[in-house]
Amino acid sequence: MADPDWTLPAPEVEAIVSGRHGDPFAALGLHQSGNDWVVRAFVPGAEELEVLDKDGKRLVWLPRRHQAGFFEGSLPLSNRQTLGYLARNAGGSWTVTDPYLF
């Protein structure tokens, strides 16, 4: 099965997790792709990442694409909105505000 059109190419994911991406704002955060809303996040140390709306409501789990903590997935949204994340690993959980939401 082919990746969706909005999937970030593997070399770009590698560039993000290694700190070499020339324009992380173009890749990370919430983006519209056709009729889909896509979110990408790099949360080092996270093994799981859940997207939260501005009120803290849990929206969806994001698939982890890179073990360093890169996550990407589509969201059931009708418009742009403020998002946060609930990150988890074996040591516990923590919340993250998406710094790329502008």
Where on the chain are the PLM-derived regions?
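Short, well-ordered beta-strand segments enriched in hydrophobic/aromatic residues
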Residues: 37-41
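The feature marks proteins involved in alpha-glucan
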Residues: 1-36, 57-60, 65-102
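Short proline/glycine-enriched turn/loop motifs at strand-loop junctions of beta-rich domains
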Residues: 42-48
